[in-house]
Amino acid sequence: MSQAMQPGDEIPTIKITPDKYLTVRYAGASGDFNPIHIDDDFARRVGLPGKILHGLWTMAQVARAQTEAAGGPHALKRLHVTFRGMGVPEHEITVTGTVDRVDDGVAIVHAVAEQDGRAIIRNAEAELQLE
């Protein structure tokens, strides 16, 4: 899709359902062992619905949608997101995006990540170097 990106084009939608063990694996990879991510009981005691996804993992899914649309990770030059809600394991996340503009071989894509009908990341803006 990368060379054909035009303003108004939608990037391919990504849908992913994080399994119940994802937060533990991500904690090990990231070093973020905050108990809200790995301990259901603790998360509930502090008012959450259960353990929640790491925000940076969710952001990585937004980045993945951009890089797959642009032909690989080399294309992602910048990514900015606004975290708007907490994602939870075992519920599908959908990442969508629309090309805002293309100038001098660089596409600006606006994206959102939603779970259960609510944005968990919004106002995402990626700068993609087109081939």
Language model region names:
Residues 1-11, 87-131:
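HotDog/MaoC-like acyl-thioester-processing domains
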Residues 1-51:
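Catalytic strand-loop segment that frames the active site of acyl-thioester-processing enzymes
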Residues 18, 83, 128-130:
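Hydrophobic residues in beta-strands and at strand termini
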Residues 25, 36, 56-57, 72-73, ...:
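Alpha-helix boundary/interfacial micro-motifs
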Residues 46-99:
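Hydrophobic beta-strand-centered segment that forms part of the acyl-chain substrate-binding groove
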